[in-house]
Amino acid sequence: MEENARRIMELVPNLRPVEFVPVAALIGVYEELVFRGFLMTRLRRATGGWTIAMILSTVVFTALHAFEQTPSALVVVAILSLVFSLVTIWRRSIIPAIIAHALFDLSQFLLLHLQAGDSWK
């Protein structure tokens, strides 16, 4: 199993697949409210534009995921952060980013569960 999967499984070792849905939803809601809803909008006001606000909030978002991710996975985290930021700006709502984030997290948890087989119950 790759290093990144091992690290994530250590964070959530006792979750059953049915418990992934509320966890994924809560993570998506929390992170999007903090990083896109609060931080990015405040940075836009402070910098006068969305581009710098997106970049700065992505740097913070990625840095805070560094303890649980490998360097190569951090690239994916940064790209996802930019995508969620663009969706928020484009739709003028944080709701689509929350849904996308929750669905992504749910898919990752389920893939890890399938990859782990019987060793992760």
Can you say where each PLM-predicted feature lies in the sequence?
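Juxtamembrane helix-loop-helix connectors linking adjacent transmembrane helices
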Residues: 1-27, 45, 113, 118-121
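Juxtamembrane/transmembrane-helix boundary motifs in multi-pass membrane proteins
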Residues: 11-15, 19, 45-49, 64, ...
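Residue-level hotspots within the lipid-embedded alpha helices of multi-pass solute transporters
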Residues: 12, 24-29, 33, 74, ...
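Hydrophobic alpha-helical transmembrane segments of multipass integral membrane proteins
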Residues: 18-27, 31, 56, 60, ...
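Active-site His/Glu-centered metal-binding helix of metallohydrolases
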Residues: 29-34, 38-39, 63, 67, ...
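Membrane-interface helix/loop boundary segments of multi-pass membrane proteins
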Residues: 30-56, 86-93
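Small-polar-interrupted transmembrane alpha-helices in polytopic inner-membrane proteins
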Residues: 50-65, 81
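Functionally important transmembrane alpha-helices
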Residues: 62, 70-121
